Amino acid sequence: MRLPLVLALSLAACGGLPDPREEKPTAPADNDPGYTVTNIGEWYVTSDAAQTQDELMTIFVAVPPATEFVDVWIADLPVQRLSKQPDGRFAIQTSIADVPPGTWDVLLAADGSTTAFARIPFNRSAPYYVLVTTDWDFADPGNQANLYQEQLHQNHAELRITHFAAPYTFTDPAVTPARRQELAAWLIAQRDMHGDEIGLHIHPYCNFVTSAGLTCVIDQSTVLNIDDTGYTIKLGAYGREDMRTLLEHAKELFVANGLGTPRTFRAGGWTATLDTVAALADAGFIADTSALNWARIEEWEGEELYRWNMENWAPINDTSQPYYPSQQNVLTDDAPTLSILEVPDNGVMIDYVSLAEMNSLFDANFDGQPLPTPRTLMMGFHPAIQFSESEYLRVDGFLKYADMHLASKRKGPVVYITLENVVAAFAP
């Protein structure tokens, strides 16, 4: 935020004050209580291609009578002189864009003293991107789940949700045309009012698969021997070309219903293979988040869903970070790579973690120290008729924890962002 400051007077007008000393003063053993320094934040986050931060530092100093001038040394930037304000304080507002990540000091000295009257530390950090997502497992999530999401936006003003919406909303015969349009209008409102994203989620329901002109697979379920609805079928059961067909059909359905063209994706049950991700790249998608921190869905241990994810996403864990998958192996970034960013679902879904676990995942990726490079925490939940108040409260509780570290409040490096927007921070 830019504050109105009086510009520095010329040396002549100031009665020939000496130039600022380049050499930093000695830090004081304790800050001098005769000076009151305000407005310096605890955290300043770097800008990048995904987002722009206010990289200005504002300093006000109330000084003892007869103080002639105040100089400041910010990190390793050149010394600068503060301007005297009409109320007698001294102030400066200056860019710290050239200060790299780390913990730094602001040193302030008066009247050319070689000992500073104040040393104030601050943190300069790359952003900690927190991504909140929803997976539409069902054609109609119900009104209560949507109301809960509206409440989350009300409680957390900076929240951005990536809604992985469902193409089967528009092919399930149980959903009336009027209800389809009601759900589409709700998604559009979230995007337009809150800056949310409308991405794509696919469980290969037969009503959707057959509407795309394909034969529905029913014998590769993560839960059942046969699933003639298609819901629990591994998405990887559809090869690269068939997956491309499903994606193009989904895009057509979204565009026809006013949702725009989705650019990001998560597979139902996280069951994406290399062919799945390659098909996404073929279809122009820019990011996928099917790579699962599988150890956190231990509720499914002993079942095919757990086994499949453990085998296919073996190295993905609490602290896995974005990468461009190899054309030969979806788990590595060996060249040549696909033109799609994989952002691991390292925070899993709220269905499978307690609030304490969710907060510990936040801490695993941010230990309170400045980040040298951007990091991501991906989490989400399933909006559905079954979505409970306790699940809502876990999401809300986690967001309260994340809000304590917001970059905009100078309290930490947290920036809420959608999946499509975070891609720019991880350009290949």
Residue positions per predicted region:
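C-terminal domain-boundary segment and adjacent tail
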Residues: 287, 356-428
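Acidic (Asp/Glu)-rich catalytic clusters
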Residues: 147-158, 176-201, 206-208, 212-223, ...
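CE4/NodB-like, metal-dependent polysaccharide N-deacetylase domain
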Residues: 153-154, 158-161, 228-273, 372-380
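Active-site beta->alpha N-cap acidic-glycine motif
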Residues: 117-197, 261-263
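Surface-exposed, short loops/turns at beta-strand junctions within beta-sandwich domains
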Residues: 96-103
